[in-house]
């Protein structure tokens, strides 16, 4: 970039001069500033600005300007002069420039960009919408302001605070608490600090060390791991920020959120130039949401900066302790892994569930419903009432998951409920878990609160110290009136008391509420206080989407912005007023739009179709709508409009009401209105009913029809929003929103009247051009008054919500000028109506004389329940609700009754009627009868035709008849339409004469079609009869059904009960007189409202102005920070020199080379300097040198007097290790013995006898398994998980891994024996195996003991292996074995021979023949107990133990002993003993069993292991091994001392393998067992690598197979970063509670079991004895021969005479028969005698296959359905032979088959059928089915019974005869 030549003020300075200038001291600069200034130009890339620099400083600033522009030309990307100027300020901050120079530049910047019109926040907010950039620019500005040290200018108080000081505004400060902010609080604090570091430096300097020291203290450090709460580092370096889950936890988020709130308050004070005392004086009150209450207390007690920081430090410490205590007091529960969200950013299950969409009463009822199934300690509580329909429920996570599941069931999400009555709808519930780690505001935290209160008992803040009111979040009371300690009150309010937020914020009527929170607090407050005249100020934001909210721009502006002004409440802003004059008038905003009082008459068909009635209302001074729904063509409507125009004053315009749901009509009606408007007809308004058009269509109406206002009648919340959207797009055009809800007369929605308005009133009132009118249910002044004043909503707990006008409809139907027939008026007057709470009863039937039916447009419509309307309602249910196809069928079946009802009850009778007055079809009528029927129905005697179009219709039919019949053409000329119009009787007489055949000829089908087509001709008034029961029946019945209410004379028999009368169910209460003029009705309502307003007001109220004032600030202020309270960070760290350390004989670990001195002993120098040392005769790496070098916190001290070297290693969390080194000769002598003695003291507290024999038994102390022990165990391994509290099941069974803790004493005792040898410093734990004895578990409360034996001592490549097996006993009965394998690394050879004991797996040997028996008996190790007893047919189980002693020559001395058992009839029998002793190289006994036997526990390995649920879990090892050492009593220093671990040659303190195993086992419990740890039978963990504290691992589980009914799992733990394996494990798990169900007859199918038969090689082949039946399964058609042996099978039958005789089961089978053929028409598989054995055989074989693969659970239950009970019995008891069972089934089936008669093909007359009542209908229950079956059986005299009750209400099976129709062919009635 080429710099333009700068004017003459530019001077060239070289770089050396610039550097000299930059480094010049303030004293060398001019002492005073010249008043004259020079405009310094800045120009870069087309952007330029000027700064007016005092001449005194120009020479100092100009070089920096040049250097800046030179550097910026290659780097910057400037978009505006302001951005360029701020970049220059940033550039100057990096230069060493005098504060005076910076001050001059700052004043020039402010003058150029701020002037007197703005302040920096608004300026930067307009500069960029990007938050990061805004933070950067604000940070630059305020750091520059700090560097300039400009204290000469006073900071002007912002306009809001100026108004507060003069009491024009009443300010309330509100602080936020836990919620979504829990995850974002650190990020928000970092952003705040980035923008306002100079203002927050001291605050962070106070809070930061406080939190850090607390988090690293002994009391709390275990939770924070390696992440102590370092606030300064977290907010200044994003690399130090912990993960969001950790941040959101209460021990972190609670204090950080509190600090953030107070930081925002601190910034506000600084920017406005106020100290906390001055700021507090401008606040009327304060409170806080949940923990925000404590921040409010800080504000109330702070009168200066010092007091503010002091109170802040105390409250932040309190919040820290409260967060920690509450977090650890949270109730534990078992939450399945599947319930946790896998989606990033989604909140998983937590302790608090936010829900919205229910009222408080409904919410409490829902909580009670869930709590009813929960124990007392798992219950849920209503924790927060955030708004009238917004709550937070808190409690155990598992309980909240139940609540969430229930909410999903009852919510209406994704369900369209628009056509369901409001009170019958499911609620639409939105719910989500909050990122909160404890259930605040519940009794669960009562004890936690008590502990915190105790900690602060000595540091109280009495409530009398509160200088301003602070309102309690539960009671809403001023804390000062409560007395006592404010901190204690707040602690209880946060921890254990529910929060009633509306109560808290409503305690004081503030004009402005300042919210020091960025989350949802401001919108929540606005929602709670909306309409109350409260302006919400978002102190933490520069922007807002809500036009009524204020932001930081408003808060700091020196001139009042439009969004800062004081708001009026809805009650004040929209209340009605009284205008003085000759007559006091009621006025609302609507008056100016309509030019009439705010009580108007709605468009309604047929009442306001008549222009004379509309004119009467308008001439009375009121507004009324002309209903377009009663006009069927443009000419008629045009005539009516002109008639109306001519009948009203010239200055009045008319409003037309059109039905949007009728597209055909509205299209020509809109065109008509457009044409008339263009012709200067004064059409002022348009009302659209029955639907809201799109924005495009509505805009077209507004812009092209010449309207002055437009009205819409939305029917739902969504439609209301559409109306508001239309108004928003046309802000200068009046939009009237007419709301009637579902209670209005005529067409209505399914909505409640009040709820939609309550939900949308706020958005309606945001648009000043929307006028809200209430309709439906009004009839007198008392009903109108609450809605005009808004008191209706106050009674419901909401702010006053006035309407601008009232809409009357039904009430006007009885007005004197209305065309309503007298008979109809009398019906209306007699209709009682209902209250508002009862109108929804009209959906199910008449209520108050009114009923809801479905109109021709498919919409609900209110009508008086006359006979005709009741018929309508009946047909809606029975006919019109059916599909088209089903409807025609129903009409055909019920034709006669429907016609009868039409003729008796409805205004539109059945058209077909012959000369005798009989109801007939059209095809049964003559041509003349049709004409006579038309005139009889369409012409009213002594009056006229009902409609002119009816004359044309009748003439068209007559002409058609003449075309079809022979007639006298000359005489026909007299059949004119004029004659028909005037004298229809004369017309018919002439027609009969002219066409004599018309009287006798029946209608031709083509003429019938022509007639029906004419009945539906568009543009003609719909016919007033029903011509046919066809597809158009609904059209004929419902179309044009309202006019009869005004012309009862035209109705058959002049019967008003036939007609449809529109009327509202509530408004019916007011129509008691039928002769009041319209003006009188309206005046009485209006005057009554005026009278009540005069009674309630002391002076006449004036109507609020329609226009809203919008002002623009004239100037903006310049901000200067004069009273800032910032301080530089200081460090008190003292550094000691190395020489001082050396003189004091103390050495740091900064480096070995600098530590030793020549004066120190040689052994010490060698110890600390040499790379290697001699251990005995072996050269080893020097562990001491490594220790010193690798431990930065190690201190070495040398005591010259005692010649001792002291080494102290400081670990994190204040754990120290200490070592004393003394030089002695012969240090290796008895070294291992001394180490064993040391470990003996560590493990057992005393020096144990090491000479005990390896073959002895070691006994441990008695231990009681207490809940405290379990809690300590959970707390110890808990830190490994993200939240272990959700992994704690409700069970008294202890984790299997606690076995090692119980047995550690006896497991570790053999390790110190002299015979084992080995260096305990090099001891490694290789594996642990835990295995329960069958059906035993360790439980809380058990008193147990332990004993152990050494099972093996032998050498392998790594060293000497020692295996110790312990038994845990309860009441001297073994419960669990714990086997631990240890390795003494590098140690080999002992004073005793190596040996190994083992309990072998059980083996099964089946002796199937004498040959097998002889082989077994030939083994000399097999010794039968009874040699005379044969073993053939026995299945023996070998239970063996082996002892191996290893010899140096490679041979081994083997001793195998055990027993061979057999099970007979459920009893164990000892058949032989096994005893083998010999020296050998293998195990002959096991070799034999492996060749000829099989494992007793069947096992299956899956080809593809896996797990259907979540199979992995990330863990992080606990930060310290000390807790597990204390718990397990394994104080091996290699786990706790860095000195020892270094001496042992490992990189650090190793985690206990037992701990790693326990952590992995808990993962298995959680992921695989769902917390049901009682199912865990065996667990083995093998340690494959070292694990260090805080290492991140991934634990994975897989289901690998089955063994003897148990599930086999593999467990793998590996490092997360490298995938290196650190633990491998296996587990055996009992299956979940299992039931095996066996089906009965009817479940058979062709080919069943064939796949199994082909693939099975085991148990299934044993069932080949049932091959006869498998053949029947393979084919269902071939006959099958059976031989002689079944001759003797008979069954007893009863003859008709009662005699009992024996009958052969197989008739025709004789002693001489050579064969017998079974037959069945569907195949033998469907013959009972073959189906039953085939089913049982299949079930037995399938179950045997399951058992052979190890799938069958031992604890299962068995059940069978009918025949299946035999299958269940066979599976349960192995003593029942399969062959016998099959044979029994065949006999049973044969007897059953022979018990009923059959035909020649074997078929019977009996059958079974499954029934599902739900498929019939909801009315069809089990009782109905039982009644139906009984009646059919009684009428048919045949067998029919319900024989199976399978699923209640869904599946029943009936049995009985088939093909027996009921006599008479009629179905029995189900009624009664």
From Swiss-Prot:
Fetch the CDD domains from UniProt: FAS_MaoC (cd03447)
SUPFAM superfamilies assigned: FabD/lysophospholipase-like (SSF52151), FMN-linked oxidoreductases (SSF51395), Thioesterase/thiol ester dehydrase-isomerase (SSF54637)
Gene Ontology MF, one = fatty-acyl-CoA synthase activity
The catalytic activity, as recorded, is: acetyl-CoA + n malonyl-CoA + 2n NADPH + 4n H(+) = a long-chain-acyl-CoA + n CoA + n CO2 + 2n NADP(+); holo-[ACP] + acetyl-CoA = acetyl-[ACP] + CoA; holo-[ACP] + malonyl-CoA = malonyl-[ACP] + CoA; a (3R)-hydroxyacyl-[ACP] = a (2E)-enoyl-[ACP] + H2O
Protein keywords: Hydrolase, Lyase, Multifunctional enzyme, NAD, NADP, Oxidoreductase, Transferase
Q: Name one GO biological process term.
A: long-chain fatty acid biosynthetic process
Enzyme Commission number: 2.3.1.86, 4.2.1.59, 1.3.1.9, 2.3.1.38
Region (Disordered) residue spans: 1111-1132
Q: In which pathway does it act?
A: Secondary metabolite biosynthesis
Pfam families hit by this protein? Acyl_transf_1, Fas1-AflB-like_hel, FAS1_DH_region, FAS1_thioest_ins, MaoC_dehydratas, SAT
Gene Ontology cellular-component annotations: fatty acid synthase complex
Q: Which InterPro entries match?
A: Ac_transferase_dom_sf, Acyl_transferase_dom, Acyl_Trfase/lysoPLipase, Aldolase_TIM, FAS1-like_DH_region, Fas1/AflB-like, Fas1/AflB-like_central, Fatty_acid_synthase
Q: Where is this region: Dehydratase (DH) domain?
A: 1158-1597
Domain MaoC-like, which positions?
1518-1617
**Region Enoyl reductase (ER) domain: start and end of each range?**
591-836
Which residues does the annotated region (Acetyltransferase (AT) domain) include? 174-425
Spell out the subunit comment. [Alpha(6)beta(6)] hexamers of two multifunctional subunits (alpha and beta).
The family annotation for this protein states: Belongs to the fungal fatty acid synthetase subunit beta family.
Function per UniProt: Fatty acid synthase beta subunit; part of the pki gene cluster that mediates the biosynthesis of 2,4-dihydroxy-3-methyl-6-(2-oxoundecyl)benzaldehyde. The first step in the pathway is the generation of the decanoyl starter unit by the FAS composed of subunits pkiB and pkiC, which is then transferred directly from the FAS to the SAT domain of the non-reducing polyketide synthase pkiA. PkiA condenses the decanoyyl starter unit with 4 malonyl-CoA units and performs one methylation step to yield 2,4-dihydroxy-3-methyl-6-(2-oxoundecyl)benzaldehyde.
This one is known as: Fatty acid synthase beta subunit pkiC
In its UniProt entry, the species of origin is given as Emericella nidulans (strain FGSC A4 / ATCC 38163 / CBS 112.46 / NRRL 194 / M139) (Aspergillus nidulans)
């Amino acid at each position: 970039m080429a710099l333009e030549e700068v004017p003459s003020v530019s001077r060239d300075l070289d770089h050396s001069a610039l550097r000299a200038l930059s480094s010049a001291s303030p004293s060398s600069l001019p002492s005073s500033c010249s008043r004259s200034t020079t405009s310094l130009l800045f120009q870069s890339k087309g952007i330029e600005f000027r700064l007016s620099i005092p001449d005194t400083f120009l020479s100092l600033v100009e070089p920096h300007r040049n250097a800046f522009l030179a550097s910026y030309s290659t780097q910057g990307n400037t978009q505006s002069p302001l951005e360029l100027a701020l970049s220059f300020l940033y550039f100057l901050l990096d230069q060493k420039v005098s504060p005076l120079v910076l001050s001059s530049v700052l004043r020039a910047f402010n003058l150029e960009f701020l002037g007197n019109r703005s302040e920096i926040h608004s300026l930067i907010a307009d500069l960029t919408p990007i938050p990061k950039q805004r933070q950067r620019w604000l940070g630059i500005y305020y750091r520059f302001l700090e560097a300039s040290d400009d204290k000469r200018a006073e900071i002007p108080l912002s306009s809001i605070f100026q108004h507060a000081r003069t009491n024009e505004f009443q300010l309330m400060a509100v602080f936020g608490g836990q919620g979504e902010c829990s995850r974002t609080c650190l990020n928000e604090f970092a952003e705040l600090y980035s923008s306002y570091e100079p203002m927050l430096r001291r605050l962070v300097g106070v809070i930061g060390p406080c939190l850090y020291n607390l988090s690293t203290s002994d009391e709390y450090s275990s939770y924070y791991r390696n992440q102590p709460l370092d606030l300064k580092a977290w907010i200044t370096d994003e690399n130090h920020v912990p993960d969001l889950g950790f941040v959101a936890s209460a021990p972190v988020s609670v204090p950080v959120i509190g600090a953030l709130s107070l930081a925002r308050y601190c910034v506000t004070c600084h920017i406005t130039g106020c100290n906390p005392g001055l700021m507090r004086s401008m606040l009327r009150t304060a409170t806080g949401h949940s923990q925000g209450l404590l921040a409010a207390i800080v504000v109330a007690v702070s009168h200066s900066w010092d007091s503010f920081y002091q109170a802040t430090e105390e409250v932040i410490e309190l919040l820290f302790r409260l967060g920690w205590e509450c977090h650890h007091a949270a109730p534990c529960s078992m939450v399945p892994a599947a319930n946790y969200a896998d989606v990033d950013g989604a909140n998983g299950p937590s302790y608090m569930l936010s829900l919205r969409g229910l009222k408080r009463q409904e919410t409490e009822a829902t909580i009670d419903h869930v709590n009813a199934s929960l124990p007392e300690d798992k219950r849920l509580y209503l924790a927060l009432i955030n708004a009238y329909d917004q709550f937070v429920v808190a409690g155990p996570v598992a309980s909240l998951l139940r609540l969430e599941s229930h909410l999903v069931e009852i919510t209406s999400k994704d369900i369209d409920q628009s056509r369901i009555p409001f009170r019958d709808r499911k609620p639409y519930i939105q719910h989500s878990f909050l990122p909160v780690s404890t259930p605040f505001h519940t009794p669960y935290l009562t004890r936690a609160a008590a502990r915190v209160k105790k900690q602060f008992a000595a540091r109280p803040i009495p409530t009398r110290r509160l200088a301003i009111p602070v309102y309690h979040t539960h009671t809403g009371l001023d804390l000062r009136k409560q007395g006592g300690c404010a901190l204690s009150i707040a602690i209880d309010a946060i921890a254990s008391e529910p929060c009633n937020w509306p109560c808290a914020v409503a305690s004081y009527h503030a004009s402005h509420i300042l919210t020091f929170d960025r989350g949802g607090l401001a919108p929540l407050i606005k929602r709670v206080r909306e309409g109350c005249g409260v302006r919400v100020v978002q102190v933490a934001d520069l922007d807002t989407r809500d036009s009524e909210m204020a932001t930081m721009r408003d808060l700091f502006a020196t001139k009042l912005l439009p969004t800062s002004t004081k708001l009026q409440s809805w009650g004040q802003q929209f209340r009605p007023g009284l205008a003085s004059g000759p007559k006091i008038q009621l006025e609302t905003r609507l008056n100016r739009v309509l030019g009439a009082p705010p009580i108007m008459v709605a468009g309604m068909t047929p009442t306001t179709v008549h222009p004379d009635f509309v004119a009467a209302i308008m001439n009375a001074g009121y507004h009324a709508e002309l209903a377009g729904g009663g006009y069927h063509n443009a000419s008629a409507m045009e005539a009516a409009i002109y008639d109306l125009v001519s009948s009203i004053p010239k200055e009045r315009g008319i409003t037309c009401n059109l039905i949007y749901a009728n597209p055909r009509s509205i299209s020509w009606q809109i065109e008509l209105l457009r044409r008339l408007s263009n012709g200067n007809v004064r059409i002022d308004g348009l009302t659209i009913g029955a639907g809201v058009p799109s924005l495009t269509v509505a805009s077209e109406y507004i812009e092209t029809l010449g309207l002055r206002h437009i009205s819409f009648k939305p029917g739902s919340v969504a439609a209301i929003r559409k109306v508001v959207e239309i108004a928003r797009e046309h802000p200068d055009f009046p939009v009237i929103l007419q709301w009637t809800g579902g209670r209005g007369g005529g067409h209505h929605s399914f909505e409640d009247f009040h709820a939609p308005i309550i939900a949308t009133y706020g958005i309606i009132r945001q648009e000043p051009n929307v006028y809200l009118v209430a309709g439906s249910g009004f009839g007198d002044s008392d009903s109108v008054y609450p809605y005009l004043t808004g008191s209706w909503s106050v009674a419901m707990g909401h702010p006053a919500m006035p309407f601008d006008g009232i809409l009357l409809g039904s009430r006007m139907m009885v007005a004197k000028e209305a065309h309503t027939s007298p008979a109809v008026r009398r019906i209306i007057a007699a209709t009682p109506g209902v209250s508002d709470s009862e109108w929804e009863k009209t959906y199910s039937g008449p209520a108050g004389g009114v009923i809801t039916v479905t109109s021709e447009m498919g919409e609900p419509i209110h009508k008086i329940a006359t006979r005709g309307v009741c018929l309508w309602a009946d047909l809606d249910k029975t006919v019109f609700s059916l599909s088209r196809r089903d409807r025609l069928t129903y009409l055909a079946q019920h034709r006669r009754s429907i016609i009868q009802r039409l003729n008796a009850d409805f205004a539109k009778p059945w058209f077909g009627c012959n000369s005798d007055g009989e109801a007939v079809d059209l095809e049964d009528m003559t041509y003349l009868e049709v004409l006579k029927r038309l005139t009889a129905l369409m012409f009213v005697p002594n009056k006229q035709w009902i409609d002119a179009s009816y004359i044309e219709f009748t003439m068209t039919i007559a002409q058609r008849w003449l075309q079809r019949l022979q007639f006298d053409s000359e005489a026909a000329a007299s059949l004119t339409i004029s004659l028909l119009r005037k004298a229809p009787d004369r017309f018919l007489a002439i027609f009969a004469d002219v066409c004599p055949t018309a009287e006798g000829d029946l209608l031709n089908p083509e003429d019938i079609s022509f007639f029906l087509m004419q009945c539906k001709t568009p543009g003609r008034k719909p016919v007033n009869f029903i011509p046919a029961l066809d597809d158009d029946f609904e059209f004929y019945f419902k179309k044009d059904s309202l006019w009869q209410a005004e012309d009862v004379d035209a109705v058959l028999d002049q019967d008003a009960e036939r007609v449809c009368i529109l009327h509202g169910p509530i408004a019916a209460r007011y129509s008691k007189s039928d002769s009041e003029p319209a003006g009188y009705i309206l005046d009485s309502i209006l005057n009554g409202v005026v009278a009540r307003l005069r009674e309630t007001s002391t002076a006449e109220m004036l109507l609020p102005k329609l226009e809203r004032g919008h002002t623009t600030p004239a100037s903006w202020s310049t901000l200067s920070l004069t009273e800032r309270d910032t301080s530089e960070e200081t460090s008190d760290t003292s550094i000691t020199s190395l020489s001082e350390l050396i003189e004091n004989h103390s050495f740091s670990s900064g480096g070995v080379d600098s530590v030793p001195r020549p004066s120190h002993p040689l052994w010490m120098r060698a110890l600390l300097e040499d790379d290697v040392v001699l251990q005995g005769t072996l050269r080893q790496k020097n562990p001491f040198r490594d220790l010193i070098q690798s431990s930065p916190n190690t201190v070495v001290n040398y005591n010259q007097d005692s010649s001792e070297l002291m080494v102290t290693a400081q670990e994190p969390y204040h754990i120290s290790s200490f070592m004393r080194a003394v030089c002695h000769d012969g240090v290796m002598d008895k070294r291992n013995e001394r180490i064993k003695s040391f470990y003996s003291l560590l493990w057992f507290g005393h020096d144990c006898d090491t000479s005990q024999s390896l073959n002895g038994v070691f006994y441990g102390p008695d231990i009681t398994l207490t809940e405290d022990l379990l809690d300590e165990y959970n707390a110890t391994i808990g830190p490994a998980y993200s939240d272990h509290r959700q992994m704690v099941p409700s069970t008294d069974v202890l984790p299997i891994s606690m076995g090692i803790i119980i047995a550690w004493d006896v497991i570790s005792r053999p390790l110190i024996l002299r015979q084992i040898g080995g260096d305990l410093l090099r001891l490694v734990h290789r594996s642990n195996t835990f295995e329960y004895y069958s059906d035993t578990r360790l439980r809380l409360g058990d008193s147990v003991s332990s004993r152990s034996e050494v099972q093996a001592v032998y050498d392998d490549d790594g060293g000497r292996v020692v295996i110790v097996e312990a038994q845990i006993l309860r009441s001297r009965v073994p419960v669990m074995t714990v086997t631990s394998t240890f390795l003494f690394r590098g140690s080999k050879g002992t004073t005793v021979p190596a040996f190994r004991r083992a309990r072998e797996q059980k083996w099964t040997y089946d002796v199937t023949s004498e040959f097998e028996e002889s082989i077994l008996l030939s083994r000399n190790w097999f010794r039968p107990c009874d040699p005379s007893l044969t073993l053939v047919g026995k299945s023996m189980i070998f239970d063996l133990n082996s002892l191996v002693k290893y010899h140096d020559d490679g041979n081994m001395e083997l001793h195998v002993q055990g027993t061979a058992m057999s099970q007979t009839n459920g009893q164990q029998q000892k058949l032989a003993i096994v005893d083998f002793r010999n020296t050998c190289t293998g195990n002959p006994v096991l070799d034999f069993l492996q060749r000829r036997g099989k494992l007793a526990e069947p096992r299956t390995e899956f080809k593809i292991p896996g797990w259907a649920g979540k199979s992995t879990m990330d863990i992080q090892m606990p930060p310290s091994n000390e807790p597990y050492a204390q718990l397990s009593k394994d104080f091996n220093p290699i786990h706790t001392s860095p000195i020892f671990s270094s001496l042992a040659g490992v990189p650090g303190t190793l985690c206990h393998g037992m701990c790693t195993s326990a952590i992995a086992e808990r993962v298995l419990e959680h992921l695989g067992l769902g917390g049901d740890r009682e199912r865990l039978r065996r667990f083995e963990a093998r340690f494959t690598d070292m694990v260090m504290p805080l290492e991140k691992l991934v634990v994975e589980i897989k289901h690998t197979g089955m063994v003897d009914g148990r599930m086999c799992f593999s467990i793998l733990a590996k490092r997360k970063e490298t995938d290196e394996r650190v633990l491998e494990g296996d587990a055996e798990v009992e299956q979940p509670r299992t039931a095996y169900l066996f089906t009965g007859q009817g479940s058979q199918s062709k080919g069943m079991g064939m796949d199994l038969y082909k693939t099975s090689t085991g148990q299934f082949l044993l069932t080949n004895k049932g091959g006869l039946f498998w053949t029947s399964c393979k084919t269902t058609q071939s006959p099958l021969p059976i031989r002689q042996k079944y001759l003797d099978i008979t069954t007893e039958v009863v003859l008709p005479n009662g005699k009992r005789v024996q009958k052969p089961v197989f008739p025709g089978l004789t002693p001489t028969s050579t064969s017998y053929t079974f037959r069945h028409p569907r195949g033998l598989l469907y013959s009972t005698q073959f189906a039953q054995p085939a089913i049982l055989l299949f079930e037995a074989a399938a179950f045997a296959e399951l058992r052979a693969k190890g799938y069958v659970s031992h604890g299962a239950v068995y059940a069978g359905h009918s025949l299946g009970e035999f299958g269940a019995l066979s599976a349960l008891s192995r003593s029942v032979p399969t062959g016998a069972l099959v044979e029994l089934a065949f006999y049973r089936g044969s007897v059953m088959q022979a018990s009923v008669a059959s035909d020649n093909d074997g078929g019977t007359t009996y059958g079974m059928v499954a029934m599902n009542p739900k498929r019939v209908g909801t009315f069809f229950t089990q009782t109905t089915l039982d009644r139906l079956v009984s009646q059919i059986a009684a009428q048919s005299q045949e067998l029919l019974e319900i024989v199976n009750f399978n699923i209640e209400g869904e599946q029943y099976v009936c049995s009985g005869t088939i093909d027996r129709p009921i006599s008479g062919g009629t179905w029995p009635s189900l009624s009664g």
